Amino acid sequence: MAKKLYIKTHGCQMNEYDSARMADLLKTGEAVEVTDNADDADILLLNTCSIREKAQEKVFHQLGRWKSLKTKKPDLIIGVGGCVASQEGQAIIDRAPYVDMVFGPQTLHRLPDMITEVRTKGNGVGVVDVSFPEIEKFDNLPEPGADGPSAFVSIMEGCSKYCTFCVVPYTRGEEVSRPVDDVIAEVAHLAAQGVREVNLLGQNVNAYRGETHDGDQMDLAELIEVIATIDGIDRIRYTTSHPVEFSDALIEVYERVPELVSHLHLPVQSGSDRILAAMKRGHTALEYKSKLRRLRKIRPDISFSSDFIIGFPGETDKDFEDTMKLINDIGFDMSFSFIYSARPGTPASDLPDDTPMEVKKQRLSILQDRLNQNVMDISRKMVGSTQRILVTGLSKKDPGEYAGRTENNRIVNFRHENPEVVGHFIDVEIVEAYPNSLRGVPVSSELF
């Protein structure tokens, strides 16, 4: 009888990709089927994120809920992976001895061996592997299975920027790029399964420098041009980018590759040069704006989104005003924003912070109100326009409708008579705008 696997994922798109690969790996190695119900599982995996405040407590809170399942089912295997696992290692098992194994983002390919070791040793002997074997995991993962017409493809791991607030270099290691041929093979394999859109992933994806078969190197701009030639791939996205690595070559590729969507997520974190320097971001607000303006000249319809940290240590009213000015100047679309929380072991965690939490919350509210207004303004301007959307499946709100995404990542709900519309592009007229979605009407029955 097949063992049942349940995976709970916290955090970023990279973690979503890693969780999917864990499932692929375990389904290939033994008789395993994925379940949506933790109560039914024989193997429970928690893929963790350490970016936000109290990440560790969130992990132990979830593990506490699983402890009772272990009591009822002693042979149940519980594993913790991801960035909190990389940070905490053995400390997770010390605090939660019912956890059987702890593994980092770079060692998830060793899961089958770890599970075998747990079964051999029996309960009470935790297995920990949070080493950094660079790109080894990709050499030991099975070919990915497609799950719909859009897919994530990890092209690099880690970050070497060491921004003062960020824990990523300590949990995922230095930047390591996958070889070009490996990336191309994975994208081609997904395309053969009906994938029409790929989202290239990396903690600092535009720092990609992949080795070619002849020992040369290829950057992200060149990789995008190659991927665009793969039959069946009609949309390309990438995330997450760093402004310093947003090169002239990458800007220019938007002029040559129509498959590259007219949307860019480029985290800036702050609009204050003083705060950017304290964060060790390596650029000014003006340098950031100049790159986006160059890109907008090439793609006038492009939309931009970003990440913003509010209340970084020492942030003054003037610093916050500079951030709001940047938001107003650029007109950011859907973006992420949150109050700064110190991550253990990062340089910023040692900085004095005398800004009251109430002030930080007020600033965040002002910023989010402005961003939400931008989102609605952009959505309303889309009403009456014709948008080509990739149909991803049934609508989550109404199973009698279908849903798809625009280039600028808007969800569009619409009705259609042909069930074969899923996995295809169609043209729809946008007729209504809502806070989190759009409503569309197909302009023809033609599928692309």
Curated annotation (Swiss-Prot):
- What is the organism of origin for this protein? Marinobacter nauticus (strain ATCC 700491 / DSM 11845 / VT8) (Marinobacter aquaeolei)
- Positions binding [4Fe-4S] cluster 2 in this chain are C159, C163, C166
| Stored HAMAP family | tRNA_metthiotr_MiaB (MF_01864)
Name listed for the protein in its UniProt record: tRNA-2-methylthio-N(6)-dimethylallyladenosine synthase
Where is this protein localized, as stated in its record? Cytoplasm
Q: What is its main location?
A: cytoplasm
Q: Which GO terms describe its cellular component?
A: cytosol
- Which reaction equation describes what this protein catalyses? N(6)-dimethylallyladenosine(37) in tRNA + (sulfur carrier)-SH + AH2 + 2 S-adenosyl-L-methionine = 2-methylsulfanyl-N(6)-dimethylallyladenosine(37) in tRNA + (sulfur carrier)-H + 5'-deoxyadenosine + L-methionine + A + S-adenosyl-L-homocysteine + 2 H(+)
Q: How does it assemble?
A: Monomer.
Q: Which SUPFAM superfamilies does the UniProt entry name for this protein?
A: Radical SAM enzymes (SSF102114)
Pfam families in the cross-refs: Radical_SAM, TRAM, UPF0004
User: Which residue ranges does the record assign to the TRAM domain?
Assistant: 380-444
